A protein has these predicted regions:
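Intrinsic-disorder/low-complexity, polar/charged segments enriched in Ser/Thr/Lys/Arg/Asp/Glu/Gln
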Residues: 3-9, 16, 47, 60, ...
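Hydrophobic/basic alpha-helical segments enriched in Actinobacteria
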Residues: 8-9, 36-38, 69, 100-104, ...
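Hydrophobic pocket/interface hotspot
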Residues: 19-20, 29, 48-50, 65, ...
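Surface loops and adjacent helix of pleckstrin homology
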Residues: 34, 53, 79, 111, ...
Length: 141
């Protein structure tokens, strides 16, 4: 495990239940999360798989749902072959999604830990804000 983490937050003018739906419904996920195809049955212990294309190359990221508290919070592990690291437990990140009512609608936080390097953190620090902006555009559009 590493101590490298990142966290990003955004306010969205939509109710928490609507945000939760966009975070956990595959056809909506693809609209805000860079066109990925997502598979999961959203149960603790179940797999979560994201398939897509990055820089012209297909990829498959995978993990497991480890915590689920509808419609407030879910946590899943995450490993990507694009990391270049072996598919081993110590190479999985933990991704936390928190959905909280706010005066403007909903505050959404995504946090990631056990990032393998500062370079990986830099990629996350570019990707998560864009994904959250895409989520807001989908829900407020």
């Amino acid at each position: 495990m590493t101590d490298i983490t990142t966290s990003h937050r955004i306010e969205i003018a939509a109710p928490p239940e609507r945000v939760w739906e966009a975070l956990t419904t595959p056809d909506q996920i693809s609209q805000w999360f860079f066109g990925v195809d997502t598979e999961s049955d959203w149960q603790v212990g179940s797999s979560i798989v994201h398939r897509g294309e990055y820089q012209g190359r297909p990829y498959e990221d995978r993990g497991e749902i480890v915590e689920l508290d509808r419609p407030r919070r879910f946590v899943h592990t995450h490993w990507s072959a694009t990391s270049g690291l072996p598919d081993a437990p110590e190479n999985y990140q933990r991704v936390l999604w928190a959905v909280e009512p706010s005066s403007d609608g909903t505050a959404v936080t995504v946090a990631e830990d056990n990032l393998p390097s500062e370079d990986a953190k830099a990629i996350s620090d570019r990707s998560w804000p864009q994904a959250l902006e895409n989520l807001r555009a989908l829900l407020e559009g």
